[in-house]
């Protein structure tokens, strides 16, 4: 169970890092938002899901 928690935390950190870099780039590009809207929403949905997964796994470990 601990390894699943560690992998979920790593995935959350990796997704956060990717979103921190990619979202400003999407907004800075001329047609970025209209072309990459689905990618931003998918990444945000993945991030929210990982937050809940880490919270659930944390409650099971503690």
UniProtKB/Swiss-Prot annotation:
InterPro entries: PSII_PsbZ, PSII_PsbZ_sf. GO terms for biological process: photosynthesis; photosystem II stabilization. It is a multi-pass membrane protein. It is found in: Plastid, Chloroplast thylakoid membrane. The keyword Chloroplast applies. The keyword Chloroplast applies. It holds the Pfam family Ycf9. The chain crosses the membrane at residues 8-28, 41-61. One of its GO terms (cellular component) is chloroplast thylakoid membrane. Its main location: plastid. It comes from the Eukaryota. NCBIfam families: PS_II_psbZ (TIGR03043). PSII is composed of 1 copy each of membrane proteins PsbA, PsbB, PsbC, PsbD, PsbE, PsbF, PsbH, PsbI, PsbJ, PsbK, PsbL, PsbM, PsbT, PsbY, PsbZ, Psb30/Ycf12, at least 3 peripheral proteins of the oxygen-evolving complex and a large number of cofactors. It forms dimeric complexes. Belongs to the PsbZ family. This is Photosystem II reaction center protein Z. It comes from Sorghum bicolor (Sorghum). The lineage of its organism: Eukaryota, Viridiplantae, Streptophyta, Embryophyta, Tracheophyta. The gene is psbZ.
